[in-house]
């Protein structure tokens, strides 16, 4: 339940830009497509034994087909926009409650990013994997 709530809140924060579509990654895997941003919780584990806090690893994937974006500029712009929308929360410039609302999040951190070009059934894709950590306390 909490994983779905976290995913939903992040998806809402990323929606509203006509350049890309935001979808949920149900099987916690990368989803490739033309200007697609997918969000999913990879795993959740107890952060501190004996305390009601949990650490969730969240993946945000950004993908774009090379055939539709030969310079990669659209892909780069979408990646920058996705990171910009979440950065104010990871840098604590905005309260976490304004992003996660009723979900009791006490920490939100950007962990790492990885960008690559991959081949799939539709041809070459640009792919970015942005990884975040969410700490909740219930």
Predicted regions and their residues:
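Charged, often glycine-rich, active-site loop that binds/positions anionic groups
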Residues: 33-42
